[in-house]
Amino acid sequence: MDSITSAASVVAAGLAVGLAAIGPGIGQGTASGGAVEGIARQPEAEGKIRGTLLLSLAFMESLTIYGLVVALVLLFANPFAG
């Protein structure tokens, strides 16, 4: 693998993880804030809100994991290596 392809793969892997973490990070903060506000308004609905929050946080975190998988493929099983 030539040095340009190798360097571009490392940069792309870093961008994949970094950019894949921005959206879910913002979404998780917003969802958690909304859940805290909802529990503060209706404490009796805490169990239902918490369950829904945890499920949605898991779905959001899966987007970051997909970015990590793309980065690992670029680093260790590079399809552009030729």
Curated annotation (Swiss-Prot):
Keywords: ATP synthesis, CF(0), Hydrogen ion transport, Ion transport, Lipid-binding, Membrane, Thylakoid, Transmembrane, Transmembrane helix, Transport. One of its GO terms (molecular function) is lipid binding. F(1)F(0) ATP synthase produces ATP from ADP in the presence of a proton or sodium gradient. F-type ATPases consist of two structural domains, F(1) containing the extramembraneous catalytic core and F(0) containing the membrane proton channel, linked together by a central stalk and a peripheral stalk. During catalysis, ATP synthesis in the catalytic domain of F(1) is coupled via a rotary mechanism of the central stalk subunits to proton translocation. Pfam families: ATP-synt_C. The gene is atpE. F-type ATPases have 2 components, F(1) - the catalytic core - and F(0) - the membrane proton channel. F(1) has five subunits: alpha(3), beta(3), gamma(1), delta(1), epsilon(1). F(0) has four main subunits: a(1), b(1), b'(1) and c(10-14). The alpha and beta chains form an alternating ring which encloses part of the gamma chain. F(1) is attached to F(0) by a central stalk formed by the gamma and epsilon chains, while a peripheral stalk is formed by the delta, b and b' chains. GO terms for cellular component: plasma membrane-derived thylakoid membrane; proton-transporting ATP synthase complex; proton-transporting two-sector ATPase complex, proton-transporting domain. Signal peptide: none annotated. The record marks E61 as: Reversibly protonated during proton transport. It is a multi-pass membrane protein. It comes from the Bacteria. The chain crosses the membrane at residues 7-27, 57-77. Belongs to the ATPase C chain family. This is ATP synthase subunit c. It is found in: Cellular thylakoid membrane. It comes from Synechococcus sp. (strain RCC307). PANTHER family: ATP SYNTHASE LIPID-BINDING PROTEIN, MITOCHONDRIAL, ATPASE PROTEIN 9. The keyword DNA-binding does not apply.
